[in-house]
From Swiss-Prot:
Name of the protein in question: NADPH--cytochrome P450 reductase
Binding sites annotated in the UniProt record for NADP(+): R289, T577, S648, R649, K659, I660, Y661, V662, Q663
Family designation: Belongs to the NADPH--cytochrome P450 reductase family. In the N-terminal section; belongs to the flavodoxin family.
Taxon lineage: Eukaryota, Fungi, Dikarya, Basidiomycota, Agaricomycotina
Function field: This enzyme is required for electron transfer from NADP to cytochrome P450 in microsomes. It can also provide electron transfer to heme oxygenase and cytochrome B5. Involved in ergosterol biosynthesis.
Gene Ontology CC, one term: mitochondrial outer membrane
Cofactor: FAD; FMN
A single BP term in Gene Ontology: ergosterol biosynthetic process
Membrane-spanning ranges: 2-24
Binding site for FMN: 72-77, 123-126, 165-174, 200
Localization per record: Endoplasmic reticulum membrane; Mitochondrion outer membrane; Cell membrane
UniProt key word tRNA processing: no
Amino acid sequence: MAVSSSSDVIVLSVGIILAALYLFREQIFSAAKPKTVQVPSSKAAAGGNGNPRDFIAKMKEGKKRIVIFYGSQTGTAEEYAIRLAKEAKSKFGLASLVCDPEEYDFENLDQVPEDCCVFFVMATYGEGEPTDNAVQLCQNLSDESFEFSNGEHKLPGLKYVIFGLGNKTYEHYNLISRNVDRDLQKMGAIRIGERGEGDDDKSMEEDYLEWKDGMWEAFAKAMNVEEGQGGDSPDFVVTEVFDHPEEKVYLGELSARALTRTKGIHDAKNPYPAPIIAAKELFAPGSDRNCVHIELSTESSGITYQHGDHVGVWPSNADKEVDRLLYALGLHEKKDTVINIESLDPALAKVPFPVPTTYATVLRHYIDISALAGRQILGVLAKFAPNPEAEAVLKDLNSNKEHYQNIVANGCMKLGEVLQYAAGNDLHADPTASNTTAWKIPFDIIVSSIPRLQPRYYSISSSPKLYPNAIHATVVVLKYKSEKAPRVEERWIYGVGSNFLLNLKYASHHDKAATLVSDDSPSEPSIVSHYPTYSIEGPRGAYKQGDVVKVPIHVRRSTFRLPTNPKSPVIMIGPGTGVAPFRGFVQERVAMARRTIEKHGPEGLADWGPIRLYYGCRRSDQDFLYKDEWPEYAKELHGKFIMRCAFSREPPYKPDGSKIYVQDLIWEDAEQIADAILNGKGYVYICGDAKSMSKSVEETLCRILGEAKGGSAEVEGAAELKLLKERNRLLLDVWS
């Protein structure tokens, strides 16, 4: 209906204004009122109901003499923090507050009582960086302008203990724990014992065990406490349940959302069962290794990714290892019994997985029974041995480091295998009730002693620009030989995640494990081989529905990214499966090139910087990954993509007969690389093995840059490399 007169317009306008004033009266008029802020009383602030970020108040309220802060990216540092808390309780009867530093403020760190101690368990992440949850803590300690409650940047007399977690294959080994230690001492804090440093490249566990005994001795003196004041008390109580609704029992689901299949985001607590679109073997027939290319559908999942991100795959433990431990614990007949688990001290030990669940589910899906059996746990389990002989074996392996190394570590023995070994059982036979001695180990000890089964991360080898509804991964299947030990034959050891994926690949092709690459060859007839199989159906058949096989995944974000400007030169070094993210990088550029050519023709790429890929493998006819794809990408990029390959087991070789690797090709192209980096402001990416390849490549880059600057690799070259890292123009995605 049309408005017929100006008076009608005025009346209508006034009506609208009045209605708006009424509807939004609180927002409009409350702005004029002064806001009142409730300030908690000092008594409330000091208690648990006060500031939740006040760790001092929580220590006092809980009568804790120890506070333990952990900087953890993958959960390992947190596990060691909890172990230290448990040992403080069992040795000295001292209660600890285990804290994620991200959840607390540190202005009152100077208020820690004199009879208390602060522990720091700090992992070094990436290129000498603090873990995400420890960034603020490290900044507060290092920033001299940061003031504690005393108005100064000082911590006089603060007692502390520090243990660092790192990997010697990385340049900045344990840098964060060293920096924290340095900063604390500069502020007048007093370290108890030596600074501990664990090396994940060798044995974090052994480094921890060697450090902790001397630390606890120094701790007892500094804190004026005596060992023996604690006691062995369980962390959990396990109860068998017989009347719980079946649909509410966790059978491998990681969260309530996953159990109820509630719609929501998919993350580490709620992985997405991604259907396998395609899966194929990348190595040539006759190879002694497997490499799986797998394509996973993310359509309608809400999952997004970028080139350079990682896909987290949630594996299960192999069937044989689950059965082995069920028999060794005397639980095989009760494997499907529903159990509930409660923590006796939630502040110290949280139940690490959802409950109620079953014995078999815990061993298959929730804890890492496939890991190397730790020396410390063997001492704990000795008293539950079925006979004196088995007890003596475990005590010896626990106390004798050399025996443990020769038998358990060199033999790559899992906990179930060690229990069989100690009891005199045959490790190589399929476990049964008749050939596996049952131990009377309380299940709560298994839960508290074995860490969670973690996802395995793989570089995504596709670009969302070409594959918006699919994630590709390139996974070499881990298989290596153990060393022969007394009563333990040399045998094949299989990686959990990659062999899980290999099983899924064959299931998606309706093949059996018998079609896998042969484990034995005429030259190695004595190696014991039992290729692992997995229950791939998943909880309640969620991962296999008819002919569709699914993989539980989530995406982990990365900063491993191409420069946004295609004019910047790019240098990528990725031998073996290190080439995986670079396939995604090249696809990203191909997608951009297609759009550019569509608008401006091929000349639109004229000012693009070159994309150089240095790739290496054994043989061009055996393990050259995506061999047929690279020439197609090169065509689409009209000369901007250059690929050089080093084949270590076929000619040409060096003049002295030695093998050619990617770093040799980089040195051959020294002039072009120096020009791309120094004049073209190019970006360098390295992906692959951190032990030797990454170090050798960085050393070669130092030589190239040092010579280009008219100096040496050690001075000018190292300075340029450092500058590249600081400016995020040298990025690494490496593993040991």
